[in-house]
Amino acid sequence: MLCFIVNEHSRSGKGAKIWKEAEAVLKKKNIAYESYVTQYEGHAFSLAHDICECGADDIQLVVVGGDGTANEVINGMTHFEKVRFGVIPTGSGNDLARGLGITGTPTEVIGHILNCREDYVMDLGQVSWNGCEKPRLFAISAGAGLDALVCKKALKSKVKDALNKLHLGKLTYLFLTVQSLFCLLYTSDAAD
């Protein structure tokens, strides 16, 4: 069963365009697939969970989105031994895809996914903290402090949207880091 979880809003809407390119390849090759478009934050988690719980023995689960969408999908997955995971990168950073060596046009990436006969093991990390209901998985990195603050701000940043439209999305993180450094409150327990 070939399933796609699509975040059309990734990279300020470029995800929808990239998905159309990938979908055209699937239709041209007459490949059977199911696609699910995310509607809200956290939806990719639910979709991945439901797909993995459907009872199929061989699931090919492909994310069309950025690192955030991929993270949601990985955390929603169950029965990992039955799932082959892939990603068509459409985000502004695409650290996961880069780390996995995924490069090329959407057409090239979908071609590789369809023709790949070899499985690769992907390491995942797990983190939990006080008040955490369930440990979270991560594929690339986990941050705390300033790093986590910048990533959280980037999720809702109008600056990110504007820079993505100018094809400068990676500068979002530099801008938000500098901005956050000037807004942090510093405390010291040291005596004066």
Task: List each language-model region with its residue ranges.
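ATP/NTP phosphate-donor binding region
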Residues: 1-61, 71, 75, 108-110
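Catalytic core of DAGKc-family lipid kinases
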Residues: 3, 79-84, 91-188
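Glycine-rich beta-strand-to-loop/alpha-helix junction loops that act as flexible
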Residues: 8, 64-66, 90
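Conserved beta-strand termini and adjacent loop/short-helix elements that scaffold enzyme active sites
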Residues: 36-38, 88, 127
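Active-site phosphate/pyrophosphate-handling residues
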Residues: 68, 72, 149
